[in-house]
């Protein structure tokens, strides 16, 4: 099957996908489209949970989220986010992040299906970290090459219902065992495209060290974070891409190169999404650059 792609780059659209006839979509074809464009919108698909799962398995190896409280009641591979009480976990993703950056195997792809969207201006912000890196002068790139960055997700881990009334120290120790700080190369090379990617995150990256474990001047990290646009409170950075979507669309992106955060709109109402996260069998997150 040849998928119909409209546009190119972030937000390119794939049209005409029939959720009841996915057998003709090949893994190589859909992956190549994502690797090339980084963020694609499959328009008006409206799949059932089972069809959404089938498409996810075509894209890659589905990895369920490590915390069961996010799981769909019938399909634990599906991560459910919802502002409707009892339908999922609310207020997810309201900060810049890369999915599973804090785990030993960060995902290759993330795929989201909106089921309810409160208004036309609700969406997601994305930053292409390869484009950011390419924009930096050599003098700013040099201190980051060959270094390792430490990423600590713990202050963004949500308290579970089962944690209520437990001692905070006990909860903190459990979080630290499940998601301890982890180190990745500050600059990675994409295993498929070869692009170099500035692999840092304002809400999780705490320090940069050289190959011998010596702390790099914190100003280097601060300047790199500022260059990405993550610190821009108005979201006016030229590196920030705003993506809107509609119920029934599927948003699929390359999780190695794109970081994202939720864009809250002006309308009240319920937001409910399903998410799948996949590996592609290649080096994750990437090779040291």
UniProtKB/Swiss-Prot annotation:
Catalytic reaction(s) noted: a (3R)-3-[(carboxymethyl)amino]fatty acid + 2 2-oxoglutarate + 2 O2 = a (3R)-3-isocyanyl-fatty acid + 2 succinate + 3 CO2 + 2 H2O; a (3R)-3-[(carboxymethyl)amino]fatty acid + 2-oxoglutarate + O2 = a (3R)-3-{[carboxy(hydroxy)methyl]amino}fatty acid + succinate + CO2; a (3R)-3-{[carboxy(hydroxy)methyl]amino}fatty acid + 2-oxoglutarate + O2 = a (3R)-3-isocyanyl-fatty acid + succinate + 2 CO2 + 2 H2O
Disruption phenotype: Deletion of the gene cluster mmaABCDE causes a significant decrease in the intracellular accumulation of zinc in Sauton's medium where metal concentrations are relatively low.
EC number of the protein: 1.14.11.78
UniProt-annotated binding residues for 2-oxoglutarate: 264
Positions annotated to bind Fe(2+): 97, 99, 260
Keyword Oxidoreductase set for record: yes
Cofactors, names only: Fe(2+)
GO molecular function: dioxygenase activity; metal ion binding
Top-rank taxon: Bacteria
Sites where the protein binds a (3R)-3-[(carboxymethyl)amino]fatty acid: 65, 70, 93, 100, 158, 275
Keyword Oxidoreductase assigned: yes
Sorted UniProt keywords: Dioxygenase, Iron, Metal-binding, Oxidoreductase
Top enzyme category: oxidoreductase
Pfam families per UniProt: TauD
Misc note: Isonitrile formation goes through two consecutive, but distinctive, 2-oxoglutarate-dpendent reactions catalyzed by this enzyme. In the first reaction, an Fe(IV)-oxo species is utilized to generate a (3R)-3-{[carboxy(hydroxy)methyl]amino}fatty acid. Then, its conversion into a (3R)-3-isocyanyl-fatty acid likely proceeds by decarboxylation-assisted desaturation.
Its job: Involved in the biosynthesis of a unique class of isonitrile lipopeptides (INLPs) that seem to play a role in metal acquisition in M.marinum. Catalyzes the conversion of (3R)-3-[(carboxymethyl)amino]fatty acids to (3R)-3-isocyanyl-fatty acids through an oxidative decarboxylation mechanism, thereby generating the isonitrile group of INLPs.
Family designation: Belongs to the TfdA dioxygenase family.
Protein name, entry field: (3R)-3-[(carboxymethyl)amino]fatty acid oxygenase/decarboxylase
Organism of provenance: Mycobacterium marinum (strain ATCC BAA-535 / M)
Gene: mmaE
């Amino acid at each position: 099957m040849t998928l119909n792609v409209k546009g190119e780059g972030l937000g390119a659209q794939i049209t005409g996908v029939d959720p009841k006839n996915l057998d003709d979509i090949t893994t190589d074809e859909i992956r190549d489209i994502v690797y090339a464009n980084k963020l694609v919108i499959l328009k008006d698909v409206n799949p059932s949970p089972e069809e959404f799962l089938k498409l996810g398995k075509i894209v890659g190896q589905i990895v369920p989220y490590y915390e069961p409280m996010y799981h769909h009641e019938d399909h634990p591979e599906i991560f459910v986010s919802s502002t409707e009480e009892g339908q999922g976990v609310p207020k997810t993703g309201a900060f810049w992040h890369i999915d599973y950056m804090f785990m030993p195997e960060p995902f290759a792809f993330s795929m989201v299906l909106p089921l309810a969207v409160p208004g036309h201006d609700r969406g997601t912000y994305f930053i292409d970290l390869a484009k950011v890196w390419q924009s930096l002068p050599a003098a700013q790139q040099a201190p980051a090459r060959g270094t390792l960055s430490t990423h600590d997700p713990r202050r963004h881990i949500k308290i579970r219902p089962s944690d209520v009334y437990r001692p905070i120290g006990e909860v903190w120790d459990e979080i630290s065992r499940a998601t301890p700080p982890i180190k990745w190369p500050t600059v990675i090379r994409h295993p498929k495209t070869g692009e170099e990617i500035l692999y840092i995150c304002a809400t999780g990256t705490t320090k940069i060290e050289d190959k011998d474990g010596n702390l790099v001047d914190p100003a280097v990290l601060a300047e790199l974070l500022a260059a990405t646009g993550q610190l821009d409170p108005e979201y006016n950075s030229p590196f920030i891409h705003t993506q809107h979507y509609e119920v029934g669309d599927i948003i699929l992106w390359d999780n190695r190169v794109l970081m994202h955060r939720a864009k809250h709109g002006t309308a009240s109402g319920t937001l409910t999404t399903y998410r799948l996260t996949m590996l592609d069998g290649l080096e994750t997150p990437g090779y040291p650059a």
